[in-house]
A protein has these predicted regions:
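N-terminal, polar/charged subdomain of small-to-medium soluble alpha/beta proteins
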Residues: 1-270
Length: 270
């Protein structure tokens, strides 16, 4: 790999307040805070700019910032996917790009909000750029019985659940922008992220497990089988498991096929 392949220009933490589909209270026309990160890999790297100390040979992030503000400000968007399309249309030519949009208050049940990402990379075989799309719901607050110790079997303890979903960007964007539900197409930026978070809380509350591994796997099953995603990676933090650490926990990733080919157990209830 060329040394210039890792050269990047970025903007972090662009803050806007606009309509990007339903807010956490499911109101379709209410503005909400959004945070945007942009990463660009320049087509010819940054060598020329470094050698000549000349900004004309690089991507001017000052101009990029002004262009993004002009494109996004004073607009409303049907959903986050629509916003990402407008942002990506504003980007200069680059070898690769990454766009991440965070809704810090987009989900009532998730203290860490929800983040959507779009990253391009060229196929090794044909050179055609493919866009990987991710959705991360962070810090879903839950309480349940989980653990082997006697005291853990008596009282529910607080858990923080984060869900990471990844796939190739859906090609049916006209249908998505028309409001087709997650049950019809698997785009990751529809308001189904709220339904995912709420269903996790509903299932976990009142459940009982001896291991956090079993609980995380059960949540993977819920996200893939019930919500139709091809894969899910679930992280569970147990802040009160060990007094001397901030949190203990696990991360488990499973595909929908994993559960389709075996008789996995249901959510265990107390």
């Amino acid at each position: 790999m060329s040394s210039t392949a890792v050269d990047q220009v970025f903007l972090k933490g662009l803050k806007f307040e606009t309509v990007v589909g339903p807010d956490a209270w499911h109101r379709p026309t209410k503005s909400q805070p959004i945070e945007v990160d942009i990463v660009l890999t320049p087509t010819n790297g940054l060598d020329a700019a470094a050698q000549d100390d000349n900004v004309s040979y690089t991507i001017d992030y000052g101009k990029l910032y002004k262009q993004l503000v002009a494109s996004v400000s004073k607009q409303s968007f049907e959903n986050v996917h629509h916003l990402s399309q407008v942002i990506r249309a504003s980007l200069p030519e680059a070898r690769a790009f990454g766009v991440h949009v965070r809704l810090p208050k987009g989900v009532l049940a998730a203290d860490g909000g929800v983040t959507f990402g779009w990253e391009s990379h060229a196929s090794v075989s044909d050179g055609i750029a493919e866009i990987t799309q991710t959705m991360i719901i962070k810090g879903i607050a839950c309480r349940c019985i989980v653990g082997l110790n006697p005291h853990e079997r008596v009282e529910k303890q607080k858990l923080e659940v984060s869900i990471h979903i990844q796939g190739v960007e859906n090609r049916l964007s006209p249908a998505i922008l028309a409001g087709v539900s997650m049950d019809t197409v698997s785009d990751l930026s529809t308001p189904a992220y709220q339904a995912v978070a709420n269903s996790v809380v509903e299932r976990v509350e009142g459940s009982s497990y001896e291991t956090v591994e079993a609980l995380a796997t059960a949540i993977c099953q819920l996200v893939t089988i019930n919500h139709g995603f091809d894969n899910a990676r679930v992280t569970i933090d147990k802040p009160y498991a060990i007094a001397g650490v901030f949190a203990a926990g696990v991360t488990i990733g499973r595909s929908k096929a994993y559960f389709e080919n075996k008789d996995f157990w249901k959510i265990k209830r107390t």
